[in-house]
Amino acid sequence: MQEILIPLKEKSYKVFLGELPKIELKQKALIISDSIVAGLHLSYLLKRLKALEVRVCVIESGEKYKNFHSLERILNNAFEMQLNRHSLMIALGGGVISDMVGFASSIYFRGIGFINIPTTLLAQVDASVGGKTGINTPYGKNLIGSFYQPKAVYMDLVFLKTLEKREFQAGVAEIIKMAVCFDKNLVETLETKDLKDCLEEVIFQSVNIKAQVVMQDEKEQNIRAGLNYGHTFGHAIEKETDYERFLHGEAIAIGMRMANDLALSLGMLTLKEYERIENLLKKFDLIFHYKITDIQKFYERLFLDKKSENKTIKFILPKGIGAFEIVSHIPKETILKVLEKWH
């Protein structure tokens, strides 16, 4: 079992990578999962969990269910089983479940503890660590939420064996995101090695990158913004396609390519570096066809990004391999020229 300590000012916790251990709790626990994950992995968790009382809340699977209705269902279950401030919520699932349960636990009784047990690659390397929680709204993705850290995160690679290839590759997109912005050595690992042979090592490296970033910038004031590479465009794509056509990681892969187009036009990437990222995405089947139907509408949607302020879009753009820059005040014509390529 490998461990990563994330020491923060208000709350420190550990990320455990290895076989899920026995979890013994002296308080009540509400497990929240989705309809697919519960069928695959709930019994595995229940065999390892001992608590004063256990209840299970199952939410429909999918990004479009990351909403107020699902949040209300979670909270109603918490009230019905009379959870108190010492009780726990347990998130068993991917990024959607992790985000919703984190948010629910942050607002129930003004905050109770929760444990993350991520079951997808994307959730293991990204969503379950760092304390970003939230739900989607008709106006955009993750626009309502909070920063709220878990009590612990347990990552068991056995969960990944049931992932479809598409789900797995979506998680790789988030690994590439972190590698391009923070660690050129990880980029080289992804380029030269078979991921099957070094999966645990790559997950550990990815979580460690995110842990270091979160330790420096828990509330996303500066360096943590690098974790949003590809997300300004990616979130707009998800909203434009009603969260149904692409998985989150797939939309981020497209968003990274759009960001790369912008970085290339601004001279932040050389053509060689641009092609290197493109080839890495190709290696993991992360090149998708996407066509913007209404460029002006898509452009306006970019302003709904949480990083935007004073009617200015902030873009996270790669600056070579292994570094990034937050760029704002880019002329509208420059952005529209990039979007034209996708029209």
UniProtKB/Swiss-Prot annotation:
GO biological process: amino acid biosynthetic process; aromatic amino acid family biosynthetic process; chorismate biosynthetic process
GO MF terms held by the record: 3-dehydroquinate synthase activity; metal ion binding; nucleotide binding
EC identifiers of the protein: 4.2.3.4
Entry annotated with the keyword rRNA-binding: no
InterPro entries: Dehydroquinate_synthase, DHQ_synth_AroB, DHQ_synth_fam, DHQS/DOIS_N, DHQS_C
GO CC annotation: cytoplasm
Residues annotated as binding Zn(2+): E174, H231, H248
Protein localization: Cytoplasm
Pathway participation: Metabolic intermediate biosynthesis; chorismate biosynthesis; chorismate from D-erythrose 4-phosphate and phosphoenolpyruvate: step 2/7
Statement: the UniProt record of this protein carries the keyword DNA-binding: no
Cofactor annotation: Co(2+); Zn(2+); NAD(+)
Chemical reaction(s) catalysed: 7-phospho-2-dehydro-3-deoxy-D-arabino-heptonate = 3-dehydroquinate + phosphate
Record CDD domains: DHQS
The record's free-text note on cofactor binding: Binds 1 divalent metal cation per subunit. Can use either Co(2+) or Zn(2+).
Binding-site positions, NAD(+): 61-66, 95-99, 119-120, 132, 141, 159-162
Record's keyword terms, sorted: Amino-acid biosynthesis, Aromatic amino acid biosynthesis, Cobalt, Cytoplasm, Lyase, Metal-binding, NAD, Nucleotide-binding, Zinc
PANTHER family: 3-DEHYDROQUINATE SYNTHASE (PTHR43622), 3-DEHYDROQUINATE SYNTHASE, CHLOROPLASTIC (PTHR43622:SF7)
Function statement: Catalyzes the conversion of 3-deoxy-D-arabino-heptulosonate 7-phosphate (DAHP) to dehydroquinate (DHQ).
Family designation: Belongs to the sugar phosphate cyclases superfamily. Dehydroquinate synthase family.
Protein name: 3-dehydroquinate synthase
Protein species of origin: Helicobacter pylori (strain HPAG1)
